[in-house]
Amino acid sequence: MSREKFSLPTPIFYPHRIFSACVGAQFIAPLSRKGAINRAPTPGFQKMGVGKKNSLTLKLVRGGEGFGFCPMVGYNSFMSRSGIITLTSDFGDQDSYVAAIKAVILGIFPEARLVDISHQVPAQDITHAAYLLKSSALYFPAGTVHLAVVDPGVGSSRRAIALESQGHFFVGPDNGIFTDFLGPESRTFLLNRPEFFRPRVSATFHGRDIFAPVAGHLAKGADLESLGEPIFDPKKLPRPEPKVLPDRIVGEVIHVDRFGNLITNIPSELIPSRSTIRIMGKDIPGLSPHYQSAPAGVLLALIGSTGLLEISLPEDSAAQRLKAWTGQAVEVLFTGE
């Protein structure tokens, strides 16, 4: 598309904003009244490459002050989005908290597809929420936004963050809930731009007033960098690794699901074909292929859907039978070839 087609009155500039773009044209530089390329005084235009050819065009609108480019605060079309927002919280389903969060998101992005991972996280159990995210988030399409609110530090000095990792976006408190997505390639930003929040922010409900609107803007196409400043020290939860000794592997229970299965931190590839699994003084001979491989009431060990060693009790709860919970030691004893 030629420059002459953009020979309109001087555009209205919106400082510190990136402008909406759509696929189609090749020139995005604004023009002066004489048709010369203006030097755009905004980070948004600089970021998009003023004066350079691109496969993008900007939407021109006419306002009270003349022609200009229609702005969408912090938005661009370079980052793909799936339109999906997942929700994880400890809010349960008897109160209106989850509904309020969804209402805020839909007010910003009515086309969003909202998927509940779980709202039954035990109250303030950050580790539990982190496990749910780790075991589900990356099954969603790239460009999905994952909103997680298990936030015992709400209203305190704990930071609010958004991050990008492995093609996905995460929004929530900086309390370790996103530990498993923090790596060398991830990018984390402090949420400190109030224009992306609700007008009035409650000290007790950042899920509704900060995280929900940010998630809505991200899913709609907001640029991650526009949400705040980069940080390089997001909080991480401790992640105990199994210890491999000459005669055994020593690990621990990291999650208990609603069936009472004890999920450990021992991956399948570490477990030899001949072994005995020991927990709380009880020995389980070898691995079973599935949950019904032993009679009802008999403990068994197997590799679960996450690829980790589990202790299960057919038709009952292994956690209740053993009175075991997260942190409980589990050993895999090597019994020879």
Locate each region found by the language model:
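Short, low-complexity intrinsically disordered segments enriched in A/P/G/S/L with frequent Arg
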Residues: 6-8, 14, 29-31, 39-44, ...
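Polybasic, lysine-rich low-complexity intrinsically disordered segments
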Residues: 5, 18, 34, 47-48, ...
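N-terminal glycine-rich anion-binding loop in soluble enzyme alpha/beta folds
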Residues: 82-120
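Anionic-ligand-binding alpha/beta catalytic cores of soluble enzymes and soluble regulatory domains
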Residues: 198-265, 270
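Active-site histidine-anchored catalytic micro-motif
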Residues: 84, 108-114, 125-131, 140-143, ...
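A conserved acidic, glycine/proline-rich C-terminal tail/linker
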Residues: 263-323
